Amino acid sequence: MERYNFKLIEDKWQKHWLKNKTFKSEIDKNKKKFYCLEMFPYPSGKIHMGHVRNYTIGDVLSRFKTLKNFNVLHPMGWDSFGMPAENAARQNNLSPKKWTEENIAVMKTQLKKLGLSIDWDREISTCSTEYYKHQQKIFLDLYDKGLVYRKESYVNWDPIDKTVLANEQVIDGKGWRSGALVERKKLNQWFFKISHFSEELLSNLNKLDHWPDKVKTMQKNWIGKSFGCEIDFNIEGSKNVQSIRCYTTRPDTLFGFSFLALSVDHPMSKHYENDNEFIKFKKECSKTGTTEESIAQAIKIGFKTELTAINPFDDNHKVPVYFANFVLMDYGFGAVFGCPAHDQRDFDFATKYNLEIKTVVKPDNENDKFQIKNEAFTGPGVIINSKFLNGFSVPNESIDQAIKILEERGLGKKKTNYRLKDWGISRQRYWGCPIPIAYDENNNVVKIPKKDLPVKLPENIDINTNGNPLDSQKEWQHLVIDGKKCKRETDTLDTFVDSSWYYLRFCSANNSLNEFDPEEINYWMPVDQYIGGVEHAILHLLYSRFFMRAINKNNEQIDLKEPFEGLFTQGMVCHETYKDQDNNWFNPDEVISDDGKNYYLIKDTSKKVIVG
């Protein structure tokens, strides 16, 4: 019996599918629709087994639904802007555009050889002007709705990639791509107002019945809803300031209060801007990133002021006021009260500066003489050493009672807070979507007229410069809008913006005039099955949920808030990986075993690779 010839059969049917557009998708209201989507790939040049596994899962599901007489949409595209293309272009002396387009051609050929049931007529690429002209329209629409704004703020600065990172892109205090220790830097930045939807993003997680619990928990923790209290601490030692307000989730530990810590950007800092010691301290603080991970890993340092803060529960209890590197201005009010016995960060700070450490919470199985020793006690228990709060259980009873007393005395009020910060979207790089904004001679924001979109990236540019290559493009920067001389914004958009709405563009990929076709979107959306990595839980997946709401708010014809009905996180393909000393990754066909020895070499250079 003749062996089954895979190649012959594959070639035959793939040609048939292509010629007859077997997988072309169109609206058919006589059938149930099924929108299957895998997270689209970054065109690195070659597909790997992770891609193959991901797209095979989607292919099997799409074919199954087709056999079940569903009308299936199964598209493919390319997440093609980003820093890696810029870096690779530098290394290979190519333009990012050429490097990206060549990689797309290679990967598309590879994907087609897999015989996937993809509607290639809906193919998109985020670096094409046909895609990003619509993204620029969306930006301007959201700006008009108040969901985009610009402000000066501290940002996470990657000193290797020389760009800003969102909090979600900082992992263990390091840049998610470069691995460099992140620094704090103050810049004018553009932001999406994702915090406007904090409660809705949180509460709607309960409706995502076909999402993994792990992903929902990660998003819940990232949004970080907390219940606490705003407290006004009276201040002594200042002629100009009578009180400082702070937000805390633990007002029940006020009797263990031993210092008040302020951000270096707190309004109080203006009184120290000519103090040389404070100037040096502030510069030292810039070495710490803006994420919780960066702050947690940093050595805690403080600058002591001549001020004292008064405990609202005890007028005779006065403590020093410090500026500290672990307090950020964008959380609460840029001020925190320190209770070293029951917060490890406060404990480290108090130990360093020899401040009082007073125990006010004991474990349930300890007596009232319990004292902490070498570390803070942060568990549940019972309040002690706290006068009228003694005996209340921690945390629920004690916190409620503390807030009640503060409100009765007019010293504080209950407050709900969210950990989720607005999404910083400015990036100091060339290979990204240009922001459709300019500035007049008085630095006022001027929108690029929609009739002049897209704002295209200049070509034939030298990208081997330090910092943002667009800053050197003077001719490109200067333009006239409504008779006014203006200068273009040189930052580009975070590439996560590109992937936050691509699932919508697939629905009307061939509509050149409009970014959305409401009829197509209302038919195909939401995505019935989304497939991709769990590593995107608090990045792409959260951003996409925000974007869907923002677009819904801007377009009354689109009645949808959740983009993905079902989510499957496929896991990792675990096998040997290969990289060199410079952290460049290699495919298996680019390395060889050195005659059976326990190491591999790069084919082209014979250099050793690290096997992981």
List the predicted regions and their residue ranges.
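Amphipathic alpha-helical
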Residues: 194-226, 257, 263-302, 451-479
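Conserved active-site neighborhood of enzyme catalytic/cofactor-binding cores
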Residues: 42-73, 171-176, 280, 331-362, ...
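Conserved catalytic alpha/beta cores of large enzymes that bind or transform nucleotide phosphates
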Residues: 282-306, 315, 360-363, 388-396, ...
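Conserved oxyanion/phosphate-binding beta-strand-loop segments in alpha/beta enzyme cores
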Residues: 1-37, 66-75, 99-108, 210, ...
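Residue patterns forming the tRNA-binding/recognition surfaces of aminoacyl-tRNA synthetases
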Residues: 3, 12, 16-20, 91-244, ...
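Active-site and channel-lining beta-strand-loop segments
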Residues: 231, 245, 304-321, 326, ...
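Short, solvent-exposed turn/loop segments enriched in Gly/Ser/Thr/Pro and often Arg
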Residues: 30-31, 40, 75-84, 123-131, ...
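Catalytic alpha/beta core of large soluble enzyme barrels
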Residues: 58, 71, 266-363
